[in-house]
């Protein structure tokens, strides 16, 4: 009789997460973030989450890879084209900044800089592991 093997994959949540509240459109907010943090976030294809019952949810998505530090920065809108939330338990947050492979940047300093922008009402850092919908942030 053949044995069944079960493969379990553990997702990697090793990234920093900042939530931003803003009434600005994504491209205007992105411009302000680029100026304040000396980044070059660029719009790429929308981040899609498959939805079995309805049309796929698409979230505005920006990306920047710093070749010098090898850090990846992402700006993603928390609300889709279908008015669904990427992270429903944080429904007051309008955007998330995700930083992967961060070994140099002090997140609290980054949050402080973001809070000085006219386009940002407030910003918070989050522990990714505290979020129920954290798997939506794996891309």
Residue ranges and their predicted role:
Residues 4-12, 83-91:
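Short, flexible, solvent-exposed loop/turn segments with mixed acidic/basic and small polar residues
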Residues 38-48:
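Short, well-structured beta-strand/strand-turn elements
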Residues 26-40:
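Amphipathic alpha-helical segments
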Residues 13, 42, 134-135:
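Terminal intrinsically disordered, low-complexity, charge-rich regions
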Residues 46-80, 85:
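Surface-exposed, low-hydrophobicity interaction/linker segments
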Residues 7-26:
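Terminal, regulation- and interaction-focused segments at domain boundaries
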Residues 95, 99-139:
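Glycine-rich, aromatic-bearing surface loops/beta-hairpins
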Residues 8, 23, 32, 67, ...:
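Long, folded non-catalytic interaction modules
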